[in-house]
Amino acid sequence: EMCIRDRSDISEKIFAPSGFMKVDADYSGKPYEDWLASDWPKTYRNPSYPNIFAVGIAFAPPHQISKPRKSPNGTLITPSPPRTGMPSGIMGKTAVLSIHSILKSGENSGIATASMSDMGAACVASAGSGLRKGSAAAMTMYPVVPDYVKYPNTGRSLDDTYGEIGLAGHWIKLLLHYMFIYKAKGRPGWFLIPE
């Protein structure tokens, strides 16, 4: 239960039934056929309490990212979008830029946006050991949340969505490891390294 000064319960304004925080998304519960990329949040602010932000796995997705299906034994399969790693970094940066703008210039000036229907993501997953043997999968996806209005056949840009398996993924993962540590330490030029 979440209360404000007058002790009134504000939980329903803050949290979805799933326990995740509500943000500027469309939570109307419409059927799959009516889902749109624009249902997804852009600012990650709670509409009732705009001084509260939720990014990454903290915010409540408005719906899954693909058609709900069932396994042969009847288990419901409801894919959710990736809300960790690269997407979380972009969302976090968006929230920080908005908070900075609010503190510096006033309530609604310069609110940053980054919808998952407009952002891409990359992932490198190691599947072995060593930099001379084994393999890794390197994938990119754009946009993270499918947009069937912009890309009618697949919901995604086929030029920007692909994957490869091979040794290069290990080298990429090693390079990213050192780049992110460099960025986290705030070394010169850190801001040029993407999320």
Give the residues covered by each predicted segment.
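C-terminal, flexible cofactor-proximal segment of oxidoreductases
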Residues: 84-87, 94-195
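FAD-site-proximal beta/loop scaffold in flavoenzymes
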Residues: 5-88
